């Protein structure tokens, strides 16, 4: 993995890992704290809602801010700002009263607004610091690192909120964001070249490009369908399936979650190991993964044996990761260089709030028809993404020479 000796790649990887872990810890500790203070699931859930609103708002100014201030200043500064907002959130959330609650949500909005700059910028920076032939491998390594740190964050976050004082968890998150910003500060990029990836066109033009570049449009639609399908794997629906359909305890519920994350990590390793194969067959990998995920979801929904369900979860992880890595690589290649940041910010502005809505939709399906029907509906949605890919020859038969100029 020679490209990891590239200091720029390593710095970007380190920065993302630190900020991913810190972001998860902050989300968990805030939601738990607010729930303990208010005894309201709705009020605790407003944390995620305000984070989504911030992502939408940030999508309209990511490109101009990065173009004017430069990548390093914005990314390093954003991480340091997030550390400051954690301090402010920690102060306000420890005070009772409606006013302090809304002040906390305001700080949550600012915290997430600053964080919304990272992913579009990282998406645009990677093709600048990595040769094209290493896109799949680089995306695979970053995805693997992200999965490991997210797994650690969600796995340990709940435990830490109960076993470790609130102030220590907050302090750890602050340190992680400072380290993330410090990692970005050692990044060496040509700011003029990087600024060329920040679109100077109007917001309307960026959203128009999102809809008229065929592969970008198709992948966005597929992502929306797969987000709706994937919401059945949320903790609440999966727990209901475990209890009502399998008649098992929370132990198996935890095993299903763990199995998927293990599979996702394996998927990233597979994408790295066989990157040259996936580079030649990205379209087929995306299409085939959707088909297999549909089959595995059906297997999960109809299997009466918990062990087989756990195997289905583990098997789904690699296909999901390979598809995700191939999609990101394909987007990096087909989106014109100067439009990468704007288009990805617009795409995230669609998918972030949509992801929140999907949990409500599938939750209603599970309440009305049962958890098993919700999983069968998810399998049907995966089939729809397979059919969309199958109906788009330019996506299925994608070759690098198809890149939009």
From Swiss-Prot:
Q: Please name the GO terms of the biological process aspect recorded for this protein, alphabetically.
A: response to antibiotic
Q: Does the keyword ATP-binding apply?
A: no
Single GO molecular function: efflux transmembrane transporter activity
Top-level taxon: Bacteria
Which pairs of Cys residues are joined through disulfide bonds in the record? Answer: none
Annotated signal sequence is none
Tell me a GO cellular component.
plasma membrane
Fetch the SUPFAM superfamilies from UniProt: MFS general substrate transporter
Task: List keywords of the entry alphabetically.
Answer: Cell membrane, Membrane, Transmembrane, Transmembrane helix, Transport
Q: Keyword Disulfide bond on this protein?
A: no
Q: Where, by residue number, does the polypeptide cross the bilayer?
A: 9-29, 41-61, 74-94, 98-118, 138-158, 168-190, 227-247, 252-272, 291-311, 373-393
Tell me what topology the record assigns in the membrane: Multi-pass membrane protein
Per the similarity annotation, which family is this? Belongs to the major facilitator superfamily. Drug:H(+) antiporter-3 (DHA3) (TC 2.A.1.21) family.
Q: What is this protein called?
A: Uncharacterized MFS-type transporter YjbB
Q: Tell me which species this is from.
A: Bacillus subtilis (strain 168)
């Amino acid at each position: 993995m020679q490209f990891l000796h590239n200091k720029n790649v390593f710095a970007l990887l380190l920065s993302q890992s630190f900020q991913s872990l810190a972001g998860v810890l902050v989300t968990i500790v805030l939601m738990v704290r607010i729930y303990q203070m208010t005894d309201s699931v709705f009020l605790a859930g407003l944390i995620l809602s305000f984070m989504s609103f911030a992502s939408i708002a940030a999508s309209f100014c990511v490109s101009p801010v990065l173009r004017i201030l430069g990548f390093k200043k914005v990314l390093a500064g954003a991480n340091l700002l997030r550390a400051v907002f954690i301090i402010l959130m920690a102060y306000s959330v420890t005070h009772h009263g409606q006013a302090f609650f809304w002040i906390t949500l305001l700080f949550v909005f600012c915290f997430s607004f600053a964080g919304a700059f990272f992913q579009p910028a990282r998406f645009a920076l990677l093709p600048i610091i990595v040769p094209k032939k290493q896109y799949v491998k680089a995306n695979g390594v970053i995805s693997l690192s992200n999965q490991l740190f997210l797994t650690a964050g969600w796995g340990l976050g709940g435990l830490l909120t109960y076993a470790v004082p609130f102030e220590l968890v907050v302090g750890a998150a602050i340190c992680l964001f400072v380290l993330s910003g410090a990692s970005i500060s050692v990044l060496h990029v040509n700011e003029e070249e990087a600024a060329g990836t920040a679109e100077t066109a109007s917001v309307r033009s960026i959203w128009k490009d999102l809809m008229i570049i065929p592969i970008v449009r198709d992948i966005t639609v597929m992502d929306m369908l797969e987000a709706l399908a994937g919401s059945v794997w949320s903790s609440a629906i999966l727990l209901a399936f475990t209890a009502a359909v399998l008649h098992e305890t929370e132990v198996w519920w935890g095993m299903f979650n763990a199995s998927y994350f293990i599979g996702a990590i394996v998927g990233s390793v597979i994408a790295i190991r066989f990157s040259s194969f996936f580079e030649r067959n990205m379209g087929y990998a995306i299409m085939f993964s959707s088909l297999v995920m549909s089959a595995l979801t059906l297997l999960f929904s109809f299997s009466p044996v918990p062990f087989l369900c756990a195997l289905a979860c583990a098997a789904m992880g690699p296909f999901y990761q390979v598809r995700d890595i191939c999609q990101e690589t394909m987007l990096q290649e087909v989106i014109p260089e100067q439009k990468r940041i704007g288009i990805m910010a617009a795409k995230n502005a669609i998918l972030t709030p949509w992801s929140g809505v999907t949990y409500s939709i599938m939750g209603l399906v599970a309440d009305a028809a049962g958890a098993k029907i919700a999983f069968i509906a998810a399998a049907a949605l995966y089939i729809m993404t397979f059919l969309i890919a199958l109906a788009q020859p330019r996506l299925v038969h994608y070759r690098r020479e198809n890149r939009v100029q």
